[in-house]
Amino acid sequence: MFDLCRQFRQAPDAGTRPRILGAHLEGPYIAASMKGAQDEKYIRSPEDGSYRDILKRAGGMLRIWTVAPELLGIEALEKAARSEGVLLSAGHSDGRFEDLERAAQNGYTMVTHLYSSMSTIIRENGMRRPGILEAALLLDGLTAEVIADGMHLPPSLLRLIVKTKGADGIVLVTDAMRGAGMPAGIYKLGSLRRGQDVISDGQIARMPDGISFAGSVATTDRLVRVMTREAGVPLWQAVRMVTLNPARALGLEEIGVLQAGRRADLVVLGPDLHVCAVYRDGRRVWEKSGKGDRET
């Protein structure tokens, strides 16, 4: 993955392609009970020290790392990641409220795909104990990733997230796999050689059981449509959740807003909120014509 990012950046036509800012790695230091569609055989413990090899191989390409903050030995990984400038996000976690509270005090700034693959309220001796989900909603300073593809979360939960986190505390993500934007069919989740076959109907990817989700097939413009049309979020707020908010979460000041001196990387949406043109550094590199898509 890291090599692919580097190759993409160094390609002869890289200046006309989407800008790759780095990689977001989910795992392998996650809770097996919250693995989602991930293959359990690849889950590791941070106690084995293998995270050092991952950081070395990343060579600066790793920007966000999703880990489960309750794991034994996670503190050493956290320290190593911070030293490399990697942002930590809590996810695929079966931890308690206190685990995310500790994580937030130790440099975590994000929570990965809110509601998906994370613990929630349990009963212990009759008492209710909040989990990672409740901590993510309550704790200030944690930006929440939200898969607003119209499938993972219903409009009611999208509205609840906006009400609790506020428009500035949300980053919309596709959580897409390689079937994104493609026709319905069978696609590989993970490695092309060793990955899992999953089934896309054009709206969502599912595991072979036909029930469990295996990632999204949405493109980012769908997120904006879902938030505005189904969740009732004002357009300017939905746009902010896919532009300025993620830029701020990554600590990037040169993108995410239209302002003199910033990079003129733009996506133009039509009245139907579908993409009709793409600009990079102020130059149009793609547009949708009446006869179909074309690069310029």
Describe the residue ranges of each PLM region.
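Conserved, mostly hydrophobic/aromatic
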Residues: 25, 81, 111, 227, ...
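Structured loop/turn residues at beta-strand edges in well-structured enzyme cores
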Residues: 18, 60, 106, 168, ...
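His/Asp/Glu-enriched, well-ordered alpha-helical/loop segment
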Residues: 128-146, 150, 162-174, 179-269
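Short, electropositive alpha-helical surface patch
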Residues: 1-14, 78-87, 162-169, 234, ...
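Divalent-metal coordination cores built from histidine and acidic residues
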Residues: 1-61
